[in-house]
Amino acid sequence: MITTGVVLLLLDAGGCAKQRLPGGLSKLKPCRLAGIDEELFCGKLTVFENRETRTGRTIDLNIVVLPAFDQKTKAEPLFDLAGGPGVSSAGAAGFYAGPGKAYRRRHDVVCVDQRGTGQSNRLAIPREKTPQYYVSEMYPIDYVKQMRHALEQRADLTKYTTSIAMDDLDDVRAWLGYDRINLFGGSYGTRAALVYMRQHPDHVRSAILLAVAPTDLKMPLHHSESGARAMDLLLGECERDPPCHAAFPQISDDWKNVLEQLEKQPARVEYSPPGKAAPTTIEIQRGVFGEKIRSWMYGRDKAARIPLIIHHAANGDFASFLQQAIAPSIPDFVADGMYLSVTCAEDVPFITPEEATKLTAGNPFGNYRVFQQTRACGMWPRGEIPTDFHGPVSSNAPVLIFSGNLDPVTPPKYGEEVAKYLPNSRHVIVPEAGHGMDGLSDQECVDRLTIEFMDKGSAKDLDVSCVGRMAPPPFVTKYK
């Protein structure tokens, strides 16, 4: 599960990053990151891979700090916790250096690549990017075996769980000289934040949780259920939208029909890669097609094309599907090995066959993800987790929770669940959001609320009415 970034407020940096950093931040060095104009501060903190024995292999945790612009009235820092699991937190530096500068008015922003991600011993191997790769199964057997063999040369794959990583994060906090911190987690990053809140409660000032993934979620058990709910809502919007309904008057039937066709026989499509003369034949299986559609509901920008894609595919035309599925310019930003090390310890082993059958039978997305990840975890070493890992996290810290009503992986009910144990929390549902704010108008609404929450240290008096004005883009009804 991955969360996408929100468009953030602009604020002139005024060259403040060139100031001398106080306290523990002086341990960092000025640095330049690709695509970012201003000077940031970077460093490495070395931790033991095995935190219990404190011997053997070490990991250099990659740290990027974007300093607050107002050092005189500077408040507690914001620690960014990335999603995935497997996404680099340092990759978010571009947001906070550009459209997200408003977050840094009074707060340092600290991005730490969690062990196994980014430049902190990233657990991933290269893959050949043929056109078929983009529509192949998630975890082919040979790929998982090859990845495990390669990564075990430089990592104990059982030592990359969330609980271990959050102790790393607290080491970084102490090393940089911070006392209490604000946590900002999206998707899997919300689980990381919750675990940090349980393990290091005295150092949490506040938390912002966007698209909540509770510790007991058992990913990907509920992906099909959540995806089907989001799809019903999305297709319902199309049916009520005059242009979309006029273009695709039987869109719900189209959705059922294309899945039935692919269940009977995978589609074989001639595809001409850009810049190459010879076409290639691509096979599209039902499970892969469904998973692509579900993943495109994460952001409303891509979701706007789903009715078009479904309608044409139901009529045997997969051109628009492949146009969106095959995107060589998009990097592999999730470290697959880290994803497996987390979920094969914290989630998949606790999925029973009875649960999986009950939740996926008759579901349009079926058991694809459960099957793929269960099979992969059968070939992956399993890490240990604390006995109370799946229990609810209780905290008196102020917490602001955002959920998207059309989220296909972490629907609002998960935000409601965690809020029960957070008495100083507030749960805000964004009516038209998916698994993040991508594609919505007035995305600055969420940023304004988040910054105001951090400044006040309370969510009680926030005027959240602006979330009702965050509108999705119009449905795409024709090829572009």
Regions found by a protein language model. Name each.
Residues I2-D12:
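Bacterial N-terminal signal peptides
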Residues A155, P279-T280, K292-W296, I330-P331:
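Second-shell loop/turn segments in exported
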Residues C238, L262, M297, I310-A314, ...:
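Hydrophobic residues in alpha-helical segments
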Residues D241, K302, A313-S320, Q443:
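Short, solvent-exposed helix-helix connector turns and helix-capping sites enriched
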